[in-house]
């Protein structure tokens, strides 16, 4: 029977009808027994889960003709590239112990420079020339080998591979300087060894080309880049200072030339005056030219005081620019350290967001964990190992067959017996060797039969489209490769052992034979637990990433701490000012009132306080209204009590309603005035008298 295609162990939601891009997850691996007894070769899958063609070569040693030679050549090529990359990093990007070699080269170059200087002194000329000749030989050998190795190691970069790439690398400025110094050294050595005095004297000046060797010490040009960036960043300030200083120099030199040209021969030309102005304004002061007239001295003093300030400005601008640039580089390095924690925090936050149960449409994180979780086959083997550990290293079948003395309590819990191969129940020893699909099928059939002992007859089991016949499923040599987590309404697997029971409560062998190997944990029970565990893992990883990111936000120097405290202090002052404004608005004291209090003026009267829109004015107004209402209620209650005591209608008309104090009710005006109350009282007395006469 044709083998069904492997199914995906999906942790995410089941795929819908619409096609979507998915990662192929794990499939249940075949057991060693299945590989030994199976007739056909297992299906081989690629990295993305697609089946490989039958004729594809097998990976590993001996997978084809010439594979050993190919592997040796590949390993040699890897070692070659690794060595080339290592040499390039040592020469071009030194770190750690690689600086030892560059320090050695610097000492050689500096020694050669010192000997070149000593060779110009008559007393040390002979000794310096002999030492310099030996050192030049060493320098030629070292620099020649280094130049060749540099050109060779540049092949690790893509742009410098091949002959054209090597030529492009040789045209770099520092490589050109190395080549010029090497040729000059060879020429000097050749002229010195031939003994040609004329050639030696002519090429002696070429020794000072070795000064260029000091330039090559900074191979990456970091100092020049730093200087260029500082000059470019402060170009406007430098141009302004240089322009004003140049104007001061021209005017000072011209005026001093006009004042000194007749009386002083040192200022016979404008060029001599410019030389004097340059030496004076730059605060060098050689003293070779000085003004003699008082007019020239006054002009020189005035322009010196004015011009020196502008000539000294570029030094301060460059110094502050260098300091700011270095601080910016340190800050940039500190910010670069935050890049990885920030990326990890964003990734952890997104994965935590995507693992929320309410967002079932986000499946990428579930597929990721689906690909790294162990297969159900490994999980079944793990449960078998746990069971054997509980049974003292024996399989469940061996535990059942072990002889037990009569009357002695059983040491191990009884297990189910093995049935015939055609039945749907299996002994635990064989069920541990089965694939997860067979175990799921077995558990589902046992739940269907129930306690009515229907397991003795082979029942008809509903099978999935990818399932096989029962006879084939019972064979341990035919193991399914995978099973889907998403078939939740289908077959359930037994994945956990029952707890141990005591000897008294243990069922007999007949009952054990009737009861099959059932379990309490199913795929439906596993999936929520697995997702909950993954969700908790994502929460922990998010909290860890958040803590690490907060650690990188800490200030790294004292200046940052001061800036942080100053910013916090300003924020606190702003909050206090806002709070004070709100308190003044509630109390009813505005900015003008506060200024008046500070000056010692008298505060506003009570009437002004009542008329204010502030909270205090509103409270005073409400209190006045409440007092007015209480006074009116007292008057009405007194009037009513007097009417009840008199008991006659005549007394009701005779009683005069007291008038209300207008001062008390200044803030509240009743809809009924006192005149209306008196009129209503008279009307009430007339109506009562009429009613008594009618009676």
UniProtKB/Swiss-Prot annotation:
Residues binding a 1,2-diacyl-sn-glycero-3-phospho-(1D-myo-inositol-4,5-bisphosphate) 2, per UniProt: 220, 235, 330, 333
Presence of the UniProt keyword Membrane in the record: yes
Result after altering residue 346 to A: Loss of CALM binding. Impaired location at plasma membrane. Decreased KCNQ4 channel current
Xref: Pfam families: Ion_trans, KCNQ_channel
Gene3D superfamilies: 1.10.287.70, 6.10.140.1910
Result when mutating residue 213 to G: No effect on inhibition by potassium channel toxin SsTX
Effect in UniProt of substituting residue 288 to G: Resistant to inhibition by potassium channel toxin SsTX. Normal voltage activation
Coiled-coil stretches: 615-636
Principal location listed in the UniProt entry: membrane
Residues reported to bind a 1,2-diacyl-sn-glycero-3-phospho-(1D-myo-inositol-4,5-bisphosphate) 1: 93, 172, 219-220, 225
Residue segments, region Disordered: 1-21, 400-480, 496-515, 587-606
Entry GO MF terms: potassium channel activity; voltage-gated potassium channel activity
UniProt entry keywords in alphabetical sequence: Cell membrane, Coiled coil, Deafness, Disease variant, Hearing, Ion channel, Ion transport, Membrane, Non-syndromic deafness, Potassium, Potassium channel, Potassium transport, Transmembrane, Transmembrane helix, Transport, Voltage-gated channel
Reactions performed catalytically: K(+)(in) = K(+)(out)
Gene Ontology biological-process annotations: inner ear morphogenesis; potassium ion transmembrane transport; potassium ion transport; sensory perception of sound
Family note: Belongs to the potassium channel family. KQT (TC 1.A.1.15) subfamily. Kv7.4/KCNQ4 sub-subfamily.
Disease the record associates with this protein: Deafness, autosomal dominant, 2A: A form of non-syndromic sensorineural hearing loss. Sensorineural deafness results from damage to the neural receptors of the inner ear, the nerve pathways to the brain, or the area of the brain that receives sound information.
Complex and partners: Homotetramer. Interacts (via C-terminus) with calmodulin; forms a heterooctameric structure (with 4:4 KCNQ1:CALM stoichiometry); the interaction is calcium-independent, constitutive, participates in the proper assembly of a functional channel. The interaction with calcium-free CALM controls channel trafficking whereas interaction with calcium-bound CALM regulates channel gating. May form a functional heteromultimeric channel with KCNQ3. Interacts with HSP90AB1; promotes cell surface expression of KCNQ4.
This protein's name: Potassium voltage-gated channel subfamily KQT member 4
The organism of origin for this protein: Homo sapiens
């Amino acid at each position: 029977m044709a083998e069904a295609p492997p199914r995906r162990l999906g942790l995410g939601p089941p795929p819908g009808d619409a096609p979507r891009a998915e990662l192929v997850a794990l499939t249940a691996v075949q057991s060693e027994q299945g590989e030994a007894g199976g007739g056909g070769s297992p299906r081989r899958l690629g990295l993305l889960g697609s089946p490989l063609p039958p004729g594809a070569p097998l990976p590993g040693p001996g997978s084809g003709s010439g594979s050993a030679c190919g592997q040796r050549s590949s390993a040699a090529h890897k070692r070659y590239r690794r060595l080339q990359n290592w040499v390039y990093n040592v020469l071009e990007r030194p770190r750690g112990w690689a600086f030892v070699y560059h320090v050695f080269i610097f000492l050689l170059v500096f020694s050669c420079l010192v000997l070149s200087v000593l060779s110009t002194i008559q007393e040390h000329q002979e000794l310096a020339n002999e030492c310099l000749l030996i050192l030049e030989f060493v320098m030629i050998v070292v620099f020649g080998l280094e130049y060749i190795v540099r050109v060779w190691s540049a092949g690790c970069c893509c742009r410098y591979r091949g002959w054209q790439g090597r030529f492009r690398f040789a045209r770099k400025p520092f490589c050109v300087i190395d080549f010029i110094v090497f040729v000059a050294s060879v020429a000097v050595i050749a002229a010195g060894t031939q003994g040609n005095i004329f050639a030696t004297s002519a090429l002696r000046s070429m020794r000072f080309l070795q000064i260029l060797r000091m330039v090559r010490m900074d191979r990456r040009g970091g100092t020049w880049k730093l200087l260029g960036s500082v000059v470019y960043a402060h170009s406007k300030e430098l141009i302004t200072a240089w322009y004003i200083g140049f104007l001061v120099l021209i005017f000072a030199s011209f005026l001093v030339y006009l004042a000194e040209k007749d009386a002083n021969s040192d200022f016979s030309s404008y060029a001599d005056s410019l030389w004097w102005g340059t030496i004076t304004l730059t605060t060098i002061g050689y003293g070779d030219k000085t003004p003699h007239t008082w007019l020239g001295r006054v002009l020189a003093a005035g322009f010196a005081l004015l011009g020196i300030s502008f000539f000294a400005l570029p030094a301060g601008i460059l110094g502050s620019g260098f300091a700011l640039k270095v601080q910016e580089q340190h800050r940039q390095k500190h910010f670069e350290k935050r890049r990885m924690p920030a990326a990890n925090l964003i990734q952890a936050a997104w994965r935590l967001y995507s693992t929320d149960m309410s967002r079932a449409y986000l499946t990428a994180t579930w597929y990721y964990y689906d690909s790294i979780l162990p297969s159900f086959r490994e999980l079944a083997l793990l449960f078998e190992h746990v069971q054997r550990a509980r049974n003292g290293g024996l399989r469940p079948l061996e535990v059942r067959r072990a002889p037990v003395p009569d009357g002695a309590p059983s040491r191990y819990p009884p297990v189910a017996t093995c049935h015939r191969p055609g039945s749907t129940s299996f002994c635990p020893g064989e069920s541990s060797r089965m694939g997860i699909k067979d175990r799921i099928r077995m558990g589902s059939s046992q739940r269907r039969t129930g306690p009515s002992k229907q397991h003795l007859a082979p029942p008809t089991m509903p099978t999935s489209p990818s399932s096989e016949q029962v006879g084939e499923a019972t064979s341990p040599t035919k193991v399914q490769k995978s099973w889907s987590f998403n078939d939740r309404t289908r077959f359930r697997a037994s994945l956990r052992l029952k707890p141990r029971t005591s000897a008294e409560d243990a069922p007999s062998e007949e009952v054990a034979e009737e009861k099959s190997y059932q379990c309490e944990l199913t795929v439906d029970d596993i999936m929520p637990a697995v997702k909950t565990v993954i969700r908790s893992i994502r929460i922990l990883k998010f909290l860890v990433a958040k803590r690490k990111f907060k650690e990188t936000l800490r200030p790294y120097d004292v200046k940052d701490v001061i800036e942080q405290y100053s910013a916090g202090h300003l924020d606190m002052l702003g909050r206090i000012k806002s709070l004070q404004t709100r308190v003044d608005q509630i109390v009813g004291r505005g900015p003008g009132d506060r200024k008046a209090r500070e000056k010692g003026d008298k505060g506003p009267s009570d009437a002004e306080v009542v008329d204010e829109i502030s909270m205090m004015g509103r409270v005073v107004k409400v209190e006045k209204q409440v007092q007015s209402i209480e006074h009116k209620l007292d008057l009405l209650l007194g009037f009513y009590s007097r009417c009840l005591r008199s008991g006659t209608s005549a007394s009701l008309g005779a009683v005069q309603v007291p008038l209300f104090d207008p001062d008390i009710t200044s803030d509240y005006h009743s809809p009924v005035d006192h005149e209306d109350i008196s009129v209503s009282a008279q009307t009430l007395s007339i109506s009562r008298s009429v009613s008594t006469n009618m009676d």
